[in-house]
Amino acid sequence: MSKKNPGDPRVKKNAFVHKLYTMLHDPALSHLIWWTNRNGEQNTFALCPGKEFADCLTQYFKHGNVASFVRQLHMYGFHKVSDPLPITYPPNGNNNNNNNNKEVPPVWEFKHSSGRFKRGDETSLVYIKRRSSSNHTSGSTIYAEPIYNPLLTNPYNQPQFMYQDYSMGPPVEVQQFYNYQNQPLMYYQQPPGQVPPPPPPSLPPHQQPEMALQYHQYNNYQQPPPAPPAPPPQPGNVLFGYQQVAPPQQPGSTVQQIPANAPPTLDQTQPLSYTPQLEYQQQQYPQPPLPPPPPQLQLQTSPGIPKVNDNLSRPSPNEQHLQFRKIWPDENNEANSKPRNPSLMFDPLLRVNSEGSPKTQPNHSVSLLNNEVRSESSTSSSSTTVTSTALPPPSAIDRSVSLVGGSPFDLSSRMNNQQSFNRTPSISTPPTQNGRLPKISSPLIPSNTESQSPTMVTGTDNDVGVTSKGSTSIISVSKKPSVFSNSLQERLRPSMFEYHPIGNNLSKDVLTIPKISTNSNSGSRTTSQSSMSSASALSSKKSSLSSISSTHGNLSILNSTNYRSTSVGGSGSGPFSTSTSTSTTSPTLSSLLHHPQHEPQNSTIANGTSIRSSISSSQSISSPPLTTTTTTTTTDQRQLSNSPISRQQQQQPNNNTNKKVSVTSLLLPSHSQSQGYAQPLYKSSVIAEEENSTTSSGGGYRSKSDDDTDNMNK
């Protein structure tokens, strides 16, 4: 008991061993744990595992678990003594109790493997230490035998056994081969239980080194790039002879030629290093070698590639009749050609020669800037035909003045918009043919209008052309500022009225040329090919109030539009002034052609048909004198409230900054309007100016300039 004190300072070094030694020398625990005498040496101790011993453990440790205490004994090198020897109980222990309770489980006896844990030898406790996880040599053989596994200590054993399973032969040559290469054999990264079953024993003997070569080459494929040097040829070793075969084939054919008796793990990942061994198989087996597939594929595909190229480069005879719509014009079939709708975002003053519309230019294309009347123009001017095809009208664009065919707006609400137009009976239209629209003509020379869709062109039912013996001219009320370009894009060009908002009152001057003979048999006919304004009774393929030419044959004047023409009585040969009154509507500007002195007749315009309004008498009217009339266009904006475009138009202020002036108006004196000045011929284009106080919204008003020009003519 006196030896307990010297052992106290060493408790911190290995606490468990010193606590165990203290428990063995504690008299209060002598009946639970004590020293035993085995073979005359007191190097063993016994304990009685139970609840009482578990309660005593809490006095020395942080737990009361007997199993944990036994586990700590094993960690420090103690093990059970399994010899069936009689256990000596402590001398002062409860022998009576032990004798009475014979059915108690036997005690556990422990001994240290080194023998240093003895009774009375406390100095030797410093040598007893806890074993680490790597140092298991000090343990008993029960725990040491699974650790010293020969498969783990010798890295060549397990791959060597796997090779024996594959090749069914002795592994001596393989072992020498690895030693010669001086490289350790890589393991297959699969547990040994997943090794496939060995092939049947009828395998020929030459397959054994072959499998060895496969395995070695697979390992070299997994290893880093520095490969071992090629071994010198040895006559006794067959493995090196296999590596010196002809160059390998391409990998595509070698993978397919692996024999069925090869291991599946090698078939799953076949590197390029298997190709020498595969060639050796082809040499060994008597079956004829298969030709390499990649050259066959090249031979099969090589004739096909130039065939595809020939088909691409050499068009088929049916390619001329393709089923897609061409964007270029077809000279052979002009009626079916569909020119593309050109972009509206182009320079309006730039001359564009569109290839999308076939052009038949007239020989009498005269500018608006002519300062004298060319009355020598022949009435037999060449009739220009324009192939009109279905173009989608850009009605979604905010056009201030446009009679776009198929407009989605309700035109019946804008019937009351008026436009008074006074002119002499010098208008007749030639026959129409196949829905073709004429090219624009000069202000001095008439043009033969040919159309089937509603254009506001007055003509006869019998389609009698203008038959004037003398100098005849039809003034085109609707002229663009530039008539130099007669292409489809010029017809789609925005007019001056679309670039600026329109005021309440628009005034335009119309000048007619004397000696116009008109043969009218049964009235006037209104047809349209392009979106024309109500002032398009004069032959013009362009619209002054509308710049969008809808060549689809859309109706500019829809179902609720009334066409009114005055009844002309008798035939006159003197200075006789005849005027027609027409009431049309457009999506944003309503034009009423109304004469102030006559009562109009109403006729409903049908959609998609030739619109005809009868004139009461068929007559031959000749008006020798020159009659200059002033047309006043009045727009009642209260009637435009139903149109979203007109509502936007009403919101725009009528400022002087938005003044609409044509190019030709710059050549006239500024006081010509107020003085009743007879406008020259190039003033015949429609000019929208400031709001004039002399104009009014009533249809029966006649301006001062009208009276002056009539007096001058008389």
UniProtKB/Swiss-Prot annotation:
Q: Where DNA binds (residue ranges)?
A: 15-134
Give me the stretches of Polar residues compositional bias.
Answer: 266-275, 310-321, 354-372, 413-435, 444-461, 599-608
Q: Name one GO cellular component term.
A: nuclear chromosome
Keyword field: Activator, DNA-binding, Nucleus, Transcription, Transcription regulation, Virulence
Ranges of Pro residues compositional bias? 193-207, 223-235, 286-296
Q: Which SUPFAM superfamilies does the annotation name?
A: Winged helix' DNA-binding domain
Which residue ranges have biased composition labelled Low complexity?
Answer: 276-285, 376-389, 574-591, 609-641, 648-658
Q: One GO molecular function term?
A: DNA-binding transcription activator activity
Biological function: Transcription factor that plays a role of activator of filamentous growth and which is involved in invasive growth at a high temperature. Required for human oral epithelium colonization and damage. Promotes filamentous growth in EFG1- and FLO8-dependent manners. Antagonizes functions of SFL1.
> What family classification does the UniProt entry report for this protein?
Belongs to the HSF family.
Q: What is this protein called?
A: Transcription factor SFL2
